[in-house]
């Protein structure tokens, strides 16, 4: 079920909740007011009894005491009714909270299921691409085998289609340029198996790269795309790992 459907159903279920809460709160306020009125009546009866107890007959005393007792009984009833209303209001809100928790759990389960389906689709798609790339590599290998003799005579350095060229940066920042080379082109280029790898991606050098200004950096060189750069920054630049280490210090 889509997120919009879960939200729509939940909003429908709580549509009358504000009115029900308002009604219960109003009833509790009414009970409070009636209790206060009874307490005032009890105070009046108690004062009357204390002030005229000596002049009243036994029957009159009993009548006043009975009125006070009945008023206290009604106060207790109003208090019990208020407690019941408060419990009903709490259960009403709690029911909707539990409904929301259940819908959220179902929504999260649906999201996980869709992520698994998407992952399976991506996996099967990548297998197809890998198979196509393998066939392409076989064709390239056959083409290279035709010129094997000439390749063997060429020095290893000539097999690298990419060559690091250090520039003289304006701000003393190490920088590397490789011309207009794209990562997709690197897959088709014959690379010396002994060629060193760089960057967080552990790939060979290609495209625009930048050097970390930390002399103790274990990686040193990074592809622009891998560290989120599009242009050479001004001043000194430190890689993500070295930046974290500098912050800790």
From Swiss-Prot:
Residue ranges that the Swiss-Prot or TrEMBL entry lists as coiled coil: 25-118
Q: Where does Zn(2+) 1 bind?
A: 199, 201, 223, 226
Region annotated Disordered sits at: 115-163
Domains as described in the record: The PHD-type zinc finger mediates the binding to H3K4me3. The N-terminal coiled-coil domain mediates homodimerization.
* Native organism taxonomy: Eukaryota, Metazoa, Chordata, Craniata, Vertebrata
Which keywords has UniProt assigned to this entry? Answer: Acetylation, Apoptosis, Cell cycle, Chromatin regulator, Citrullination, Coiled coil, Metal-binding, Nucleus, Tumor suppressor, Zinc, Zinc-finger
Where is it made, tissue-wise? Isoform 2, isoform 3, isoform 4 and isoform 5 are expressed in the mammary gland, ovary, spleen and muscle.
Q: How is it modified after translation?
A: Citrullination by PADI4 within the nuclear localization signal disrupts the interaction with p53 and increases susceptibility to degradation.
Map motif Bipartite nuclear localization signal onto the chain: 127-148
Location of this chain's protein in the cell? Nucleus
CDD domains cross-referenced by the UniProt entry? ING_ING4, PHD_ING4
Q: Which residues carry this modification: N6-acetyllysine?
A: 112, 127, 129, 146, 148, 156
Q: Where are the zinc fingers (PHD-type)?
A: 196-245
A cellular component term from Gene Ontology for this protein is: histone acetyltransferase complex
The record's InterPro entries line, in alphabetical order, gives: ING_fam, ING_N_histone-binding, Zinc_finger_PHD-type_CS, Znf_FYVE_PHD, Znf_PHD, Znf_PHD-finger, Znf_RING/FYVE/PHD
Q: Which family does it belong to?
A: Belongs to the ING family.
* Marked site positions, Histone H3K4me3 binding: 198, 209, 213, 221
Q: Specify the superkingdom.
A: Eukaryota
Predominant place of localization: nucleus
Q: What is this protein called?
A: Inhibitor of growth protein 4
């Amino acid at each position: 079920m889509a997120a919009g459907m879960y939200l729509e159903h939940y909003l429908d279920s709580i549509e009358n909740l504000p009115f029900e809460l308002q009604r219960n709160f109003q009833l509790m306020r009414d009970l409070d007011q009636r209790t206060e009125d009874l307490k005032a009546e009890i105070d009046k009866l108690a004062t009357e009894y204390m002030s005229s107890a000596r002049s009243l007959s036994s029957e009159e005393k009993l009548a006043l005491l009975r009125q006070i007792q009945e008023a206290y009984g009604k106060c207790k009833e109003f208090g019990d009714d208020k407690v019941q209303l408060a419990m009903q209001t709490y259960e009403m809100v709690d029911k909707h909270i539990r409904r929301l928790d259940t819908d959220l759990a179902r929504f999260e389960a649906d999201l996980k299921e869709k992520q698994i389906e998407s992952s399976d689709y991506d996996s099967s798609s990548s297998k197809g691409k890998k198979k196509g790339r393998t066939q392409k590599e076989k064709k390239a290998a056959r083409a290279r085998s035709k010129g094997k003799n000439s390749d063997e005579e060429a020095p290893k350095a000539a097999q690298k289609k990419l060559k690091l060229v250090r520039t003289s940066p304006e701000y003393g920042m190490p920088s590397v340029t490789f011309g207009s080379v794209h990562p997709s082109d690197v897959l088709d280029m014959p690379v010396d198996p002994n060629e060193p790898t760089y960057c967080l991606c552990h790939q060979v050098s290609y495209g625009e790269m930048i050097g970390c200004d930390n002399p103790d950096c274990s990686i040193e060189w990074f592809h622009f795309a891998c560290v989120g750069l599009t242009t050479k920054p001004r001043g000194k630049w430190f890689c993500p790992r070295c930046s974290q280490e500098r912050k800790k210090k």
